[in-house]
């Protein structure tokens, strides 16, 4: 009886993961958590750019997240855990999601502007559709393409403050290509989350363990990247309270809480829907600036929110 119950639960998990349903209000609220927390990530990374090298920042971020998750999810590391038969898949998730994506973004912030980084990252819904079509057999509907366009338009509205002529002043630099590579990797990472193997689907029911498994392999990749950084470049760490505050924020908020919420959102709504929510990040950044810095919100912020939410609505499955 117990085995049958577990089998039914696993089958349901696989069905939910493989066939995303129309998102409910609770799913939408969950998917709004990651961009809200990630809104401060670019700011924190920019603040820390003079205090610590980008690869080192990423390594320390996930080291701290690992230490936080270990007491509550350490069972996944034991011999005989469902993690080890799936270690290759988790190694790929760790590379694309926890290690490579963030390392490339931090690296980009050393050579590019926050506007350029956000602009290139806003193309993620497009890459999500293309990766789903090329590698996971997902059809692309005209309304999904329209939804991606509206979502990107909403981001552009925030970045240009409603003055489209500002786009003519943008110049692509090396850091922008780092963000493009990160966005492509994030698209593959999201689809892998949506199409788990039976074993990883079972493990994903406990998201702290599922995330810790990714972080474990992400640390391996991050250690390799950081070693190369210290060997090949003049890497540095300027210890102090400002850096410690940045590390605490990026480890707890954008790492543990945001990744857990994003994974849960993908499981229910699918990668193509979840991708549009990431485009709320620049809008939330502007709203947080209004709250903490006293900067007044403007009409274009409201219009941008409408465009992004319209893109989300169009991206949903019928």
Predicted region positions:
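Hydrophobic alpha-helical transmembrane segments of multi-pass integral membrane proteins
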Residues: 26-30, 56-71, 92, 147-153, ...
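Specific transmembrane alpha-helical segments of multi-pass solute transporters/efflux pumps
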Residues: 37, 41-44, 70-121, 131, ...
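Helix-helix packing/entry segments at the starts of transmembrane helices
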Residues: 58-60, 98, 102-103, 116-123, ...
């Amino acid at each position: 009886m117990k085995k049958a119950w577990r089998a039914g639960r696993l089958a349901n998990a696989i069905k939910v993961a493989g066939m995303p349903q129309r998102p409910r209000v609770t799913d939408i609220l969950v998917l709004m958590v990651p961009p809200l927390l990630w809104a401060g990530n670019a700011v924190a990374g920019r603040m820390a750019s003079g205090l610590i090298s980008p690869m080192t920042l990423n390594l320390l971020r996930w080291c701290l997240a690992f230490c936080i998750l270990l007491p509550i999810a350490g069972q996944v590391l034991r011999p005989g855990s469902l993690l080890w038969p799936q270690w290759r898949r988790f190694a790929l998730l760790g590379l694309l999601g926890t290690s490579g994506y963030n390392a490339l973004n931090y690296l980009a912030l050393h050579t590019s502007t926050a506007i350029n980084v956000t602009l290139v990252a806003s193309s993620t819904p497009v890459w999500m559709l293309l990766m789903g079509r090329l590698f996971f057999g997902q059809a692309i509907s005209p309304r999904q393409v329209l939804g991606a366009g509206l979502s990107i338009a909403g981001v552009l509205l925030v970045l240009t403050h409603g003055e489209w002529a500002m786009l003519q002043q943008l110049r692509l630099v090396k850091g922008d290509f780092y963000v493009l590579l990160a966005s492509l990797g994030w698209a593959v990472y999201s689809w892998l989350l949506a199409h788990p193997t039976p074993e990883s689907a079972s493990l994903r029911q406990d998201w702290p363990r599922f995330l810790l498994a990714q972080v474990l392999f992400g640390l391996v990749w991050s250690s390799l990247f950081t070693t190369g950084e210290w060997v090949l470049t003049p890497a540095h760490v300027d210890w102090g309270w400002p850096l410690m505050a940045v590390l605490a924020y990026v480890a707890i908020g954008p790492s543990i809480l945001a990744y857990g919420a994003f994974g849960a959102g993908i499981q229910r709504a699918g990668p193509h829907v979840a991708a549009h929510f990431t485009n709320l990040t620049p809008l939330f950044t502007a709203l947080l600036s209004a709250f903490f810095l006293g900067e007044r919100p403007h009409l274009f912020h409201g219009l941008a929110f409408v465009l992004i939410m319209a893109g989300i609505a169009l991206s949903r499955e019928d």
